[in-house]
Amino acid sequence: MPRREKGVPMQFKNILVPFDESEHAQAALHLAIDLAGDDPDAVINIITIVSSDIMPPSMISSTGVLGETPIDYGSYETLLTSMAERADRELHDSLAGLLGKDMDTIMARLAIETRLAPSPVDGISSYAADHRCDLIIMGRRGLGALRGMLGSVSYGVLRSSDIPVLTVK
């Protein structure tokens, strides 16, 4: 894919790249960086989603008496916070390794966030809306028919998004 010509303004100024460290997500990030080029107004939002629905509601209780192995809500929140902090560290480490010396030059245009959401699709869609993103670039994966070829997350984002979604492999 040819790079955008220097000095030509980019149509998309607020790009969202959901990142899960996969090869497809890495390709999506590199494409976003190429599309942004040297446009000083372009922002690349990089997010990773931690699922907040890791336990069924019947196992979470303020009294600790529901479910087979109940966990109180405070412990559940602590667990989610710990998972999000670990995911955030891993995201930053992964980006530093992936971008290397280029990270310093583009860091001012990156917005990096780890978000808790019921599902990756919900997290990506709500982030895009909250931050008024105008393009989502994400990896695609899977096997089978259309839904399988795109992967369940990219398929869900394509179906739920009101903005353009570009999937890459």
Q: Predicted segment positions?
A:
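Structural beta-alpha unit
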Residues: 2-10, 51, 93-135
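Small/aliphatic-rich secondary-structure junction motif
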Residues: 7-76
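General small-molecule cofactor/ligand-binding pocket signal
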Residues: 45-47, 111-115, 166
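Short secondary-structure boundary segments
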Residues: 48, 139-141, 169
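Short glycine/proline- and acidic residue-enriched helix-loop micro-motifs
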Residues: 71-83, 110
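Glycine-rich, Arg-bearing micro-motifs that act as flexible, cationic patches
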Residues: 135-156
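Short, flexible loop segments at boundaries between secondary-structure elements
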Residues: 160-169
